[in-house]
From Swiss-Prot:
Quaternary structure, from the entry: NDH-1 is composed of 14 different subunits. Subunits NuoA, H, J, K, L, M, N constitute the membrane sector of the complex.
NCBIfam families: NDH_I_N
Topology within the bilayer: Multi-pass membrane protein
Reported function: NDH-1 shuttles electrons from NADH, via FMN and iron-sulfur (Fe-S) centers, to quinones in the respiratory chain. The immediate electron acceptor for the enzyme in this species is believed to be ubiquinone. Couples the redox reaction to proton translocation (for every two electrons transferred, four hydrogen ions are translocated across the cytoplasmic membrane), and thus conserves the redox energy in a proton gradient.
Listed name of the protein: NADH-quinone oxidoreductase subunit N 2
GO biological process: ATP synthesis coupled electron transport
Catalysed reactions, semicolon-separated: a quinone + NADH + 5 H(+)(in) = a quinol + NAD(+) + 4 H(+)(out)
Organism (species): Sorangium cellulosum (strain So ce56)
Chief location of this protein within or outside the cell: membrane
Ranges annotated as spanning the membrane: 11-31, 44-64, 82-102, 117-137, 140-160, 175-195, 222-242, 254-274, 289-309, 323-345, 356-376, 394-414, 419-439, 472-492
One of the Pfam families matching this protein, by short name: Proton_antipo_M
Length: 506
């Protein structure tokens, strides 16, 4: 059933979560200019958290009431369970990042936080707005504009430490790679528009289906245009070979920003990728019996991304850089769901995104806690003996590392189980090849995750005194470890909920 199309005025009620973020961003600017200096930072944090709570709460309300799908603003945006699910995810992730920046100290970014606090929190809220738009876009032009909104703000956040050479280098590399990927993606969109004469994804799907039925195969123009568009999507999710910016940007950016980039924009990239391929190139874009090239294309992309990420992570000495390559590998795991191009595959991707947010945010939070107490040291040496110096934080990190590896009883194991199950359920030799490569990559990842575990618990440190960890930072890390374990032993309701949220996609 096609969603009901609403005009601009009627759409505003369903656009309320984004309107809250827009109003809050404007209010933050006013507060930054007019508030007393001693109240400024606390007010910015409170206003940001309140706005995110309202935005995420509205998304949760729409999910709970199972509101009927709508096409907002004459078909530009989708209002459905999928977009509302990601509204909640983005609000939670952004709220966690705001908590990372709570006074009295924000690791790696304290001087900039005190000097440019208004700009920082405003940018974070607008970035959350852009991610919401990415997940809901059903029009090629809005996909491009929302992706660029997220990208431009990410550039600024990566270079927020203006007096730090690494941060400036990270921002410059991010801009260069982002600009090239953006141009290539826009070029691919022009091919899709040229062959379909439309920018709405549903109309593109109908036109592509007609051409595919007429020719008996997917038109070459559609394949080439989609391949160009994948450059832009691949850049956002750090898929090989568009991943080269990721290690330098993650290492050079302030750690709270790195934590955000590793989960927020990446999840948004997968959301818009799911939306585009489901609505424009899904089941309705080709008649029965006509083979499409997308499973093979995504299978190759997944294998390359997993392998590059895991092999590169093996030789890293900086934990933050290691986690950057780890995030590349996890993008490869999530791409496994696209290689089968089925409802089960999409549900597995969405569930893996939920679990990945918990374990990756938690891992970066522990890195921040360690760097905060070691003078900014983010290498393996700073983690020596952490199991004795800060046992709770080390235990939380152990949970995150086990989950990132994909071992039971953690959420990462269940996430990978559903991904591989969807892959093998598709059948065929190609699915088995991809599955074997995926399992081998999981084994490779065990080496560098286990290396950090060994460093924390078996290596001795010159420091024997307990490591003081900021209560909010350590407490939040331990709190994130709870759902990471809980979803490894009792995942059914969450998976069923996520699967229902993506079931309306083609």
């Amino acid at each position: 059933m096609e969603p009901r199309t609403l005009d601009n005025v009627a759409s505003l009620a369903y656009f309320a979560p984004e309107l809250v973020l827009i109003a809050a961003a404007l209010l933050l600017v006013v507060w930054d200019l007019a508030s007393p200096a001693r109240l400024k930072l606390a007010g910015l944090v409170i206003l940001s958290l309140a706005a995110l709570a309202c935005s995420g709460g509205l998304g949760a309300y729409f999910l709970a009431t199972d509101a009927a799908p709508r096409a907002l603003f004459h078909g530009l945006l989708a209002f459905d369970r999928f977009s509302n699910l990601f509204r909640v995810i983005f609000a939670l992730v952004t709220g966690a990042i705001v908590l990372f920046l709570v006074p009295p100290r924000a690791p790696g970014i304290e001087p900039e936080l005190r000097r440019d606090s208004g700009e920082l929190f405003t940018l974070i809220l607008v970035l959350s707005l852009g991610m919401n738009l990415m997940a809901a876009s059903r029009h090629l032009l809005l996909i491009y504009l929302s992706l660029e909104l997220v990208s431009v703000i990410s550039f600024v956040l990566a270079g927020f430490k203006i007096n730090d050479a690494k941060s400036s280098e990270a921002a410059l590399k991010y801009v260069i790679f982002g600009g090239v990927a953006s141009g290539i993606m826009l070029y691919g969109m022009s091919w899709i528009f040229g062959i379909t004469a439309s920018m709405r994804l549903d109309e593109c799907a109908a036109r592509i289906a007609a051409l595919t039925a007429q020719q008996g195969k997917v038109p070459e123009v559609v394949f080439v245009g989609t391949a160009f568009m994948l450059a832009g999507f691949g850049y956002k999710i750090s898929a090989a070979p568009f991943h080269m910016w990721t290690p330098d940007v993650y290492e050079g950016a302030p750690t709270p920003v790195t934590a955000f980039l590793s989960v927020g924009p990446k999840a948004a990239g997968f959301a818009v990728l799911i939306r585009f391929f489901s609505d424009a190139l899904g089941a309705g874009s080709a008649p029965p019996g006509v083979a499409t090239p997308w499973p093979v294309l995504f299978g190759c992309l997944a294998m390359a991304t997993m392998t590059v990420g895991n092999l590169s992570a093996l030789e890293q000495e900086n934990v933050k850089r290691m986690l950057a390559y780890s995030s590349i590998a996890h993008a490869g795991y999530m791409l496994l769901g696209f290689s089968v191009f089925s409802g089960a595959g999409v549900a597995a991707i969405a569930f893996y995104i939920v679990t990945y947010c918990f374990m990756n945010l938690g891992a970066f939070m522990v890195v921040m806690a360690v760097a905060e107490e070691s003078g900014g040291d983010e290498t393996f040496a700073a983690f020596r003996g952490l199991g004795r110096r800060a046992p709770l934080v080390a235990a939380a990190m152990a949970v995150f590392l086990v989950s990132l590896t994909g071992l039971p009883p953690t959420a990462g194991f269940i996430g990978k189980f559903y991904l591989f199950s969807a892959l093998l359920a598709a059948g065929g030799a190609w699915s088995w090849v991809i599955a074997v490569v995926g399992v081998l990559n999981s084994v490779i990842s065990l080496f560098y995750y286990a290396r950090l575990l060994r460093t924390m618990y078996l290596d001795r440190s010159d420091r024997t005194e307990p490591t003081p960890v900021r209560p909010l930072l350590g407490g939040t890390a331990c709190a994130l470890a709870i759902p990471t374990v809980l979803l490894g032993v009792y995942w059914g309701p969450v998976y069923d909920f996520v699967a229902r949220s993506v079931s309306m996609l083609r």
